[in-house]
């Protein structure tokens, strides 16, 4: 899969306040893709970010599920360190027809809008 296929999704994820650092991506030979990034666990919106992404990507509704999964990934903590340094998050697509740009559109339609505006996240 061409790197340009990921631009809309990675650009969108970079706007989410709790997501920091670089965003990796790739795809297998069958076209199933993944995007990997870090959520700053000290950010006040860290767990709300996890909740929002988990809701849309893992279980939007009983009748409307996306062919994606959102989950944490980590190397062995005993060999590396704690979650502030080595915990990452990955979005994986299980259907080659579901493209990264389509995923971005689903997130845009369901996460706070504009996603970069802290007030839209309902911070108190």
Explain the meaning of each model-derived region.
Residues 1-124:
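Structured alpha/beta or helical-core interaction and ligand-binding surfaces enriched in interleaved
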């Amino acid at each position: 899969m061409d790197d340009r296929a990921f631009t809309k999704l990675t650009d969108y994820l970079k706007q989410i306040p709790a997501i920091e650092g670089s965003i990796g991506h790739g795809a297998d030979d069958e076209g199933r893709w993944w995007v990997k990034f870090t959520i700053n666990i000290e950010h006040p919106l860290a767990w709300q970010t996890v909740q929002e992404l988990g809701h849309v990507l893992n279980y939007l509704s009983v009748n409307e599920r996306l062919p994606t999964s959102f989950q944490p990934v980590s190397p062995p903590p005993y060999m590396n360190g704690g979650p502030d340094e080595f915990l990452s998050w990955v979005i994986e697509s299980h259907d080659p027809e579901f493209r990264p740009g389509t995923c971005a559109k689903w997130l845009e339609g369901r996460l706070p809008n504009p996603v970069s505006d802290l007030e839209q996240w309902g911070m108190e």
